[in-house]
């Protein structure tokens, strides 16, 4: 069977930037585990805040965490209370000084993470998987995407045998390196087990001269 390379990993260094911007030699493994802990903690704490990408930069005993979110108000909280509490928890988790940047995603329908999360939450609320995918595709195309492809895998409608079913509209040129393709996968916890949701969104071409660190803005 044909296997597909990760669309974002294939474009890193060409039209996409790294989500972790630091260099280390002996401390590499420690920093990597710390990055994973930060990402897991933030996604758990801000599960309802429409968090997409988490970028991490490092200096000496300092960690800069950039959160791309469609709901910046929810992340910041009243008078900055939520973001201050999050910063304090991350300081305790890492033992370092953590600085948090909040970047608003102005067009969430062009962000694969948020579209996939929306489909997954609908599946958990027992919305039909075909309907959830088709509605997401319509919203994304209306938002200005050149193409979108979605796929839901697992025990669809509670079937005994797991299968995959997907839909697409427009073009999604996975082999074109200058094509700005956002990709994400999410999980939906249903009464019949987990369903996997994959989303590919083609947002147009990006020339290597002007790298797109995070689209949808």
Curated annotation (Swiss-Prot):
Read off the InterPro entries from this record: KH_dom, KH_dom-like_a/b, KH_dom_type_2, KH_sf_prok-type, Ribosomal_S3_C_sf, Ribosomal_uS3_bac-typ, Ribosomal_uS3_C, Ribosomal_uS3_CS
Tell me the ranges covered by the KH type-2 domain, including all copies.
38-106
Keyword rRNA-binding in annotation? yes
Q: Which GO terms describe its biological process?
A: translation
Q: Which GO terms describe its molecular function?
A: mRNA binding; rRNA binding; structural constituent of ribosome
Coiled-coil residues are none
Q: Which family does it belong to?
A: Belongs to the universal ribosomal protein uS3 family.
The name under which this protein is listed is Small ribosomal subunit protein uS3
């Amino acid at each position: 069977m044909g296997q597909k390379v990760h669309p974002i990993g294939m474009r890193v260094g060409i039209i996409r930037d790294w989500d972790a911007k630091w260099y280390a030699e002996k401390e590499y493994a420690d920093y990597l585990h710390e990055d994973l802990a930060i990402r897991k903690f933030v996604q758990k704490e801000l599960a309802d805040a429409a968090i997409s990408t988490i970028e991490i930069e490092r200096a000496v005993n300092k960690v800069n965490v950039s959160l791309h979110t469609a709901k910046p108000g929810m992340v910041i909280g009243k008078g900055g209370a939520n973001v201050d509490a999050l910063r304090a928890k991350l300081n305790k988790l890492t033992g370092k000084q953590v600085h948090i940047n909040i970047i608003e995603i102005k067009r969430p329908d062009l962000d694969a993470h948020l579209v996939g999360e929306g489909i997954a939450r609908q599946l958990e609320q027992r919305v039909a998987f075909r309907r959830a995918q088709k509605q997401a595709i319509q919203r994304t195309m209306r938002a200005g995407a050149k193409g979108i492809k979605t796929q839901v895998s697992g025990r669809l409608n509670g079937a005994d045998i797991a299968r995959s079913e997907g839909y697409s509209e427009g073009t999604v040129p996975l082999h074109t390196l200058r094509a700005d393709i956002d990709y994400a996968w999410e999980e939906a916890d249903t009464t019949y087990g987990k369903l996997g949701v994959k989303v590919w969104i083609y947002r147009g071409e990006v020339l290597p001269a002007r790298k797109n660190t995070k689209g949808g803005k």
